[in-house]
Amino acid sequence: MEGYLPKKHIKVIEQASDWKSAVLLASQPLLKEKLITQEYIDNMIASVHEHGPYMVLTDYFALMHAKAGVGVNEQSMSLLVTKSQVDMEGKPIKIFLVLAAKDATSHLAALSQVMEVFMDDDVRETIMLGDKETIVNIFN
């Protein structure tokens, strides 16, 4: 799983003012490295407005994404953990995983491995504790 979620793409904060701010913060490492554009971030936010919190896959975990290829310069992921939960359209979130896919299929192997981590309740609880080094070690 090494390389899918490098240390520089993992952030831990105390709290975010709202879910949109959390998505912006979660996306910053990818935007800074020009792996995605602002359009991709805007599209993720618009998707939640249009379709509701469907990106919330399990308690406290949102897999943020938008249409593959649009605003994506390179396949990449980033992670934001908020120690205080953030409300996303009625769903409490502490973990925001941003997935930027270049196309419909090339990201599936990486996504599968990362999702195994987040679907493990014990590991997800450990991630929510917010110790960055522990989180980095889980993914690298």
Model-found features: residue ranges?
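Cytosolic covalent-transfer regions centered on His/Cys nucleophiles
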Residues: 1-140
